[in-house]
């Protein structure tokens, strides 16, 4: 079994669609091994997204991610990283395949509902950024 990391972003929490996202996650066969609702500080968002610090969207991304609560999740499934990325869909909801979370629930490239690890290395950084080993079941 592989683990991946997911965030239900502030736009989804604000629109009260977190339950719809969680239904899709469980419906796709993922086991939720860690979950909590948190309100990131801008500094915490900057630490999490440090790999993008030189990108022009970095400041706006960190401001967005810290504007309201998020739900962070550790997910488990065979080939979890690829499976979660497929379920999320393309970053821009306009380009995402029908039936994906971002196509069906995303608003824009900025407010695209969910985040997911893009590699085993990312998951290895992202999961412990938010969860201690005692918080994962």
Swiss-Prot record:
* Catalytic residues of the enzyme: 115 (pros-phosphohistidine intermediate)
Its GO biological process annotations read: CTP biosynthetic process; GTP biosynthetic process; UTP biosynthetic process
Q: Looking at the keywords, is Zinc present?
A: no
Q: Which Gene3D superfamilies does this entry report, sorted A to Z?
A: Nucleoside diphosphate kinase-like domain
Q: Which residues bind ATP?
A: 9, 57, 85, 91, 102, 112
GO MF terms held by the record = ATP binding; metal ion binding; nucleoside diphosphate kinase activity
Subcellular localization, as worded in the UniProt entry: Cytoplasm
Tell me which SMART domains the record gives.
NDK (SM00562)
A matching Pfam family: NDK
What CDD domains does the entry give?
A: NDPk_I (cd04413)
The UniProt record lists the EC number as 2.7.4.6
What InterPro entries is this protein classified in?
Answer: NDK-like_dom (IPR034907), NDK-like_dom_sf (IPR036850), Nucleoside_diP_kinase (IPR001564), Nucleoside_diP_kinase_AS (IPR023005)
UniProt superkingdom:
Bacteria
Q: Which UniProt keywords apply?
A: ATP-binding, Cytoplasm, Kinase, Magnesium, Metal-binding, Nucleotide metabolism, Nucleotide-binding, Phosphoprotein, Transferase
Give the required cofactors. Mg(2+)
What's one GO-annotated cellular component? Answer: cytoplasm
| Protease is among the record's keywords | no
Q: Quote the catalytic activity from the record.
A: a 2'-deoxyribonucleoside 5'-diphosphate + ATP = a 2'-deoxyribonucleoside 5'-triphosphate + ADP; a ribonucleoside 5'-diphosphate + ATP = a ribonucleoside 5'-triphosphate + ADP
Q: Give the primary localization class.
A: cytoplasm
The entry sums up its family as follows: Belongs to the NDK family.
Subunit details: Homotetramer.
Q: What does this chain do?
A: Major role in the synthesis of nucleoside triphosphates other than ATP. The ATP gamma phosphate is transferred to the NDP beta phosphate via a ping-pong mechanism, using a phosphorylated active-site intermediate.
Q: What is this protein called?
A: Nucleoside diphosphate kinase
Q: Which organism is it from?
A: Geotalea daltonii (strain DSM 22248 / JCM 15807 / FRC-32) (Geobacter daltonii)
Q: What is the lineage of its organism?
A: Bacteria, Pseudomonadati, Thermodesulfobacteriota, Desulfuromonadia, Geobacterales
Gene assigned in the entry: ndk
């Amino acid at each position: 079994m592989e683990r991946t990391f997911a965030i239900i972003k502030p736009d989804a929490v604000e629109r009260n669609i977190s339950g719809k996202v969680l239904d899709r996650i469980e419906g796709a066969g993922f086991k939720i091994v860690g979950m909590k609702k948190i309100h990131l500080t801008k500094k915490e968002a900057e630490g999490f997204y440090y790999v993008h610090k030189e990108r022009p969207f970095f400041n706006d991304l960190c401001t967005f991610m810290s504007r309201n609560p998020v739900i962070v999740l550790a997910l488990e499934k065979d080939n979890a990283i690829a499976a979660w990325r497929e379920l999320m869909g393309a970053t821009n909801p306009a380009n995402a395949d029908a039936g994906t979370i971002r196509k069906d629930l995303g608003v824009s490239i900025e407010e695209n509902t969910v985040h997911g690890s893009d590699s085993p290395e990312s998951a290895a950084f992202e999961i412990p950024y938010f969860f201690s080993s005692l918080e994962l079941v």
